[in-house]
């Protein structure tokens, strides 16, 4: 029986992905078998879960397995399973389209760098489409569990612009994928080559993987064929840690994450007592392309008593640890658990707390023992981890320990300095951790606010990530030391201030009080205050905000997110030792005085904000003053 055939076009994104994948993954083409076996394993997991409430879905066959056979004459390789199967609608939906949000942007980001592209495509999760790396035609026969045999579906494509679907009769439940291998891919029609690949990539899968093998008699003639199990078929996390090699842990990570790169670190734990569970947690080495897409699913694979329940159980990890991968196998949750039940469950809350603590400990150990790997982690996931101080008050100090920053101490844009490093180097009498926020490392490093600190040899953290101002609104101290912005008007160096200089500064303040009043009268309500400053060495003037005011960087953050921005009124600070300020103070012509004060204010605003409200007026003023 075969009818109702339809020919349909691939979604544009699928066409792009197929072309990119065939070219960029060709050097690692054997992974197609890992991906197909992994999908078959997932199909078995889904059937087991559904059969908990509907055992009739097993149709009398609960012995789930993956089977692989090949036909040298026809040049075909077939991977089949007796898992959940697909309906015609599901085959069209899953094999003809990609439902991930942001796919278009992801594909646009891919360029001509094949090594980089293969990593990105690996993160995306190529799954079924990897078959086209080695095949010029693929046929998928499938029947969903619980539907009649005549409701099977045949999906066929050459991996170009279109595919066809038609109804077929299929007695066995599950999915059978047949690859018509390209002429130069016949190496995959060799039993020992297939055994090698399966041993390498699929030994850890809890489902038996069987290969159709030939038996020969004493004369070397073929006497029989039989199915032979060629993997351990024991779920990796149920085995003793001492029996599992690093390679097996790494391959299992790739199986559950569909990432091509090895993880940075992992931890396998079996917990007994009030709670009984096994966790296997991984820290990836590369951030997924959609890490900042809040709608994208994340979380752990959830098993209950070794029965698969769901992918992406996000409730067991806080959002700031959404990069963590792995699985949780609990003995305490009910087998009929749903996402709704998980949300309001004491066991869930206890597991989340324990897994969060374990994840942070993993990162702390990585930072302590393997600095180079931790630097990789921080570069990939540091921005996400910074969200933690606002989301997880209980672990705030432990999260902050993991932060890394650029600093005037290192003279490098690399974020490698921890808060503990900074505190260990603090000068005698220093009571605060000093920092500056800016749009970029270069802007922070060259800020005039740093001049006094550089002169006195006081270290300052240079913060330029967009999230930093938000983070600092939650992280106000560390290890008993307040975090203090050096751009604040009311900055107090305390014991670090020089008493001799203080007397000189007091005399200058008195001598120039008339000048300050003239500037205040001129600028009026446009600034909050005008004062002399003694923290500049090379710059004539800066603007600053008070401690209780919104900073420039926070105002920019509000504006970028479309929120109304409160007016920021600055304190205008003038350097009495600078030649331009001395020249301005000595002017008696009020028009010239006004021009120079305006120029100094505009310079200070440009340095602080990076933009001016009226750049044309500024340029005109500069030209007028230069012309003399």
UniProtKB/Swiss-Prot annotation:
Pfam families: HATPase_c_3, HSP90
Keywords: ATP-binding, Chaperone, Cytoplasm, Nucleotide-binding, Stress response
Example of a GO MF term: ATP-dependent protein folding chaperone
Localisation per UniProt entry: Cytoplasm
SMART domains: HATPase_c
HAMAP family linked to this entry: HSP90
Stated name of the protein: Chaperone protein HtpG
Organism encoding this protein: Actinobacillus succinogenes (strain ATCC 55618 / DSM 22257 / CCUG 43843 / 130Z)
């Amino acid at each position: 029986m075969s009818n109702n055939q339809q020919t349909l076009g691939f979604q544009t994104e699928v066409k792009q992905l197929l072309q990119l994948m065939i070219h960029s993954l060709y050097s690692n083409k054997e992974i197609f078998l890992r991906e197909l076996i992994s999908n078959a394993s997932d199909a078995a997991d889904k059937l087991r879960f559904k059969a908990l409430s509907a055992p009739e879905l097993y149709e009398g066959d609960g012995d789930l397995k993956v089977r692989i056979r090949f036909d040298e004459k026809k040049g075909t390789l077939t991977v089949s399973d007796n898992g959940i199967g697909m309906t015609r609608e599901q085959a069209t939906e899953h094999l003809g389209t990609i439902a991930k949000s942001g796919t278009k942007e992801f594909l646009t980001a891919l360029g001509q760098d094949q090594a980089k592209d293969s990593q990105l495509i690996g993160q995306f999760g190529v799954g079924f489409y990897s078959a086209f790396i080695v095949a010029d035609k693929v046929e998928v026969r499938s029947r969903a569990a619980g539907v009649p045999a005549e409701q099977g579906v045949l999906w066929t494509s050459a991996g170009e612009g279109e595919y066809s679907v038609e109804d077929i009769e299929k007695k066995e439940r599950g999915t059978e994928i047949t690859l018509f291998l390209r002429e130069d891919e016949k190496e995959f029609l060799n039993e020992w080559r297939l055994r090698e690949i399966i041993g390498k990539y699929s030994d850890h899968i809890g489902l038996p993987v069987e290969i159709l093998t030939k038996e020969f008699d004493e004369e070397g003639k073929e006497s029989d064929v039989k199915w032979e199990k060629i993997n351990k078929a024991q779920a990796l996390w149920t085995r003793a840690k001492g029996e599992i090699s690093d390679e097996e842990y790494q391959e299992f990570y790739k199986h559950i994450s569909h990432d091509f790169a090895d993880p940075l670190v992992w931890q396998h734990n079996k917990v007994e007592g009030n709670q009984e569970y096994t966790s296997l947690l991984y820290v990836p080495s590369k951030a997924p392309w959609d890490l900042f897409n809040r709608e994208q699913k994340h979380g752990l694979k959830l098993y209950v008593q070794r029965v698969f329940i769901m992918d992406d159980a996000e409730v067991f990890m806080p959002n700031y640890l959404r990069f963590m991968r792995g699985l949780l196998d609990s003995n305490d949750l009910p087998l009929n658990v749903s996402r709704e039940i998980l949300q309001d469950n004491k066991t869930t809350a206890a597991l989340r707390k324990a897994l969060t603590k374990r994840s942070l400990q993993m990162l702390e150990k990585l930072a302590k023992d393997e600095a180079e790997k931790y630097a990789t982690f921080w570069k990939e996931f540091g921005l996400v981890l910074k969200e933690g101080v606002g989301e997880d008050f209980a672990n705030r100090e432990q999260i902050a320990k993991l932060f890394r920053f650029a600093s005037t101490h290192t003279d490098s844009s690399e974020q490698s300095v921890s808060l503990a490093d900074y505190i260990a180097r603090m000068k005698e009498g220093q009571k605060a951790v000093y920092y500056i926020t800016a749009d970029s490392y270069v802007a922070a490093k060259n800020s005039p606010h740093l001049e006094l600190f550089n002169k006195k040899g006081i270290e300052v953290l240079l913060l330029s990530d967009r999230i930093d101002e938000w983070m600092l609104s939650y992280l106000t101290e560390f290890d008993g030391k307040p975090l203090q912005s050096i751009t604040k008007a009311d900055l107090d160096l305390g014991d670090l201030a020089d008493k001799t200089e203080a007397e000189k500064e007091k005399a200058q303040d008195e001598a120039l009080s008339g000048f300050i009043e003239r500037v205040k009268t001129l600028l009026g309500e446009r600034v909050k205050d005008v004062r002399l400053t003694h923290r500049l060495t090379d710059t004539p003037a800066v603007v600053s905000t008070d401690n209780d005011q919104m900073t420039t960087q926070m105002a920019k953050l509000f504006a970028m997110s479309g929120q109304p921005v409160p007016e920021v009124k600055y304190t205008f600070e003038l350097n009495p030792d600078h030649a331009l300020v001395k020249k301005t103070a000595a002017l008696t012509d009020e028009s010239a005085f006004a021009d120079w004060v305006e120029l100094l204010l505009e310079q200070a605003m440009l340095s602080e904000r990076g933009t001016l409200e009226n750049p044309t007026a500024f340029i005109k003023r500069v030209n007028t003053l230069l012309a003399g």
